């Protein structure tokens, strides 16, 4: 399948770009959604935006909508609930379906699926109490990374190097999610790899002076480094792309997605997570990877939208 869309922009009909929502990633979604909306309108698509709120069901019933471009990050938009609602309404939409969206949003279940298939992912534990923190420290050792199981954009994440810091980080992460994970820290370079219409795009190497690629490094900092080409040998880059393809296939992603991967000192890659509605801001990674593959931002959003026609009519 070609990365480029050959469809006339008018063939998409009236497109609702869904963004905002109520998740902790609302501000990122607003930026992503407005960027997508502007690009679609500039391309000649009959697109309009909906900031998804309490009146969304009324908007859905009252507006003429031929298809939806989902740019909702986090819970309520990326977790299968919006996908299920649109399925019930008979409205085709971009990206992954209900099951893959729900699975990818749940970091614990995603890791369990990968582990069952023999795909490498860091050792982990679930934290529900101070005793869990102490047991995880004894089993996994330090340093560790703490993360809410159902949040994105590195919200609520922290790197810790003591039991006391682990307990504090667990308590902080629990403000965002009732399920908190702690993972073995993988020391080494981080890569992110996008998949678009079944094709793995050029990997991006990430560098930051922060202790890890956190929210500030992703969206605010000007000192974050992005390497395209990623700096790997041809053989290791091919291995990384193949691992990403297998990881996304295991989850069942569709249309577009992005996987985050670490590499340890021995050269081993470790899967962290998959995002089914990646960011589309001026700092975002999928647009960077698409540019490296020869697609500008407008061509990228048209390709994502075209997949909704080919996959869902």
From Swiss-Prot:
Catalytic activity entry: 2 D-alanine + ATP = D-alanyl-D-alanine + ADP + phosphate + H(+)
EC identifiers of the protein: 6.3.2.4
Annotated SUPFAM superfamilies: Glutathione synthetase ATP-binding domain-like (SSF56059), PreATP-grasp domain (SSF52440)
Known cofactor(s): Mg(2+); Mn(2+)
GO cellular component terms, semicolon-separated: cytosol
Pfam family, one: Dala_Dala_lig_N
Listed pathway(s): Cell wall biogenesis; peptidoglycan biosynthesis
Keywords: ATP-binding, Cell shape, Cell wall biogenesis/degradation, Cytoplasm, Ligase, Magnesium, Manganese, Metal-binding, Nucleotide-binding, Peptidoglycan synthesis
Note on cofactor: Binds 2 magnesium or manganese ions per subunit.
Enzyme class: ligase
Chain sites annotated for binding Mg(2+) 1: 260, 273
Residue span(s) of domain ATP-grasp: 111-306
GO MF entry, a single one: ATP binding
Annotated GO biological process: cell wall organization; peptidoglycan biosynthetic process; regulation of cell shape
Binding site for Mg(2+) 2: 273, 275
Binding site for ATP: 137-192
Nucleotide-binding is among the record's keywords: yes
NCBIfam families: D_ala_D_alaTIGR, PRK01372.1
Role: Cell wall formation.
Family of the protein in this entry: Belongs to the D-alanine--D-alanine ligase family.
Name of this protein: D-alanine--D-alanine ligase
């Amino acid at each position: 399948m070609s990365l480029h869309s050959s469809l006339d922009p008018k063939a998409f009909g009236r497109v609702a770009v869904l963004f905002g929502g109520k998740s902790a990633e609302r501000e990122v979604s607003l930026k992503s959604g407005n960027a997508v909306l502007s690009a679609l309108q500039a391309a000649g698509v009959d697109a309009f935006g909906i900031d998804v709120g309490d009146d969304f069901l009324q908007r859905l019933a009252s507006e003429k909508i031929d298809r939806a471009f989902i740019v909702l990050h986090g819970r309520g938009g990326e977790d299968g609930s919006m996908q299920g609602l649109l399925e019930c309404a008979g409205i085709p939409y971009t990206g992954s379906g209900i099951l893959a969206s729900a699975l990818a949003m749940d970091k614990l279940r995603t890791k369990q699926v990968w582990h069952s298939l023999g795909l490498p992912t860091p050792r982990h534990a679930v934290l529900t109490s101070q005793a869990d923190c102490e047991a995880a420290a004894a089993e996994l050792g330090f340093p560790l990374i703490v993360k809410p199981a159902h949040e994105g954009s590195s919200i609520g994440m922290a790197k810790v190097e003591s039991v006391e810091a682990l307990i504090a980080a667990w308590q902080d992460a629990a403000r965002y999610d009732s399920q908190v994970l702690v993972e073995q820290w993988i020391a080494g370079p981080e890569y992110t790899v996008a998949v678009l219409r079944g094709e793995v795009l050029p990997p991006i190497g990430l560098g930051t002076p922060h202790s890890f690629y956190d929210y500030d490094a992703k969206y605010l900092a000007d000192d974050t480094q992005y390497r395209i080409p990623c700096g790997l040998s041809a053989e290791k880059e091919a291995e990384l792309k193949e691992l990403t393809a297998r990881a996304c296939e295991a989850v069942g992603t569709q249309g577009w997605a992005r996987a985050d991967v670490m590499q340890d000192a021995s050269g081993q890659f470790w899967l962290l997570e998959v995002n089914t509605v990646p960011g589309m801001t001026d700092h975002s990674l999928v647009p960077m990877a698409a540019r490296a593959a020869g697609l500008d931002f407008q061509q990228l959003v048209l390709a994502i939208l075209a997949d909704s026609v080919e996959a869902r009519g």
